[in-house]
Amino acid sequence: MFANYNYNDFPIVKVDLSGNIENNEDFLNFTNQWLQLYNKKQEFEFIFDTYKCGLINPKYCLYTALFIKKIKQEKIQYLKKSIIYVYNKYIFHLLKIIFYIEKPVAPIDIIFNDLLNNSTTIQTI
């Protein structure tokens, strides 16, 4: 499974993104769990960890942007903040594409840990 949601620290929801999105079913699993959080009608925050994330087909940038657009149409936004830990430039650039196409639902801190150059960059969107 591409996205593993951990609700143990709710309202902080940790999402471990591992491997690749093998098919649309993997992507729908990721978005359906997000929608289930909205159905609870309680505020929450995301912490995404992409350390084990593989190469993702860029088409999922568009799918994610369209999903964000759909979420933004909700009358009440329960997502209050996200932190995304990124460890490679490829994933970092995919995120930039997503948020260029569609602005995020809530403030996001992207923490890019460049393991090759031993540096950390924080970008707030």
Regions of interest found by a model, annotated:
Residues 1-125:
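Amphipathic, Lys/Arg-enriched alpha-helical "gate/interface" segment within cytosolic domains
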